[in-house]
Amino acid sequence: MLPSCSSDDAEDDSNKSITLRNHTESGCKDISSASNTSQFDGQALRTQKYMDSTERVSLKGNSKGTLNVFHENATFTCEAKFNITVNVSGNTIVVCEDAPPSTNCICLYDLTSEVGPLENKAYTLVIKDNNANVCTHQFHYSNTLDESFEITMGSN
């Protein structure tokens, strides 16, 4: 059973010092539409551009013993107000990217978080969007870790 985004979940004593720091977000990324189209056609084109954008996660270790998590092209509502948290249970790190879901439009965002300190060992990273799994990925942490993966349907 994977931990949830709730802070009420019990944490393993060895992970109490693992925290989330230095979170940044890009704001809604501008996807421009072609000129000379109707509003509907322009919206359809923007929607297609969003759908064609590759969602990706990059993991980078560093000399501080922390993990930089870069979530590129995460889809959320326009003008999202993010609440990013991390929960750890054993070797599972859950990054929760929550934003209110009610809106009439969607945007792509780049989200960056730093998690740590981590030990040089195997972990499972789970990224959740409004408490729904976006992806699950296993990695071995080291200060030289540098890997990326695409998020596709069924990657969780």
Q: What does each model-identified segment do?
A:
Residues 2-4:
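C-terminal motif of bacterial Sec signal peptides marking the signal peptidase cleavage site
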Residues 6-156:
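Exposed, flexible binding/inhibitory loops of compact, secreted disulfide-stabilized domains
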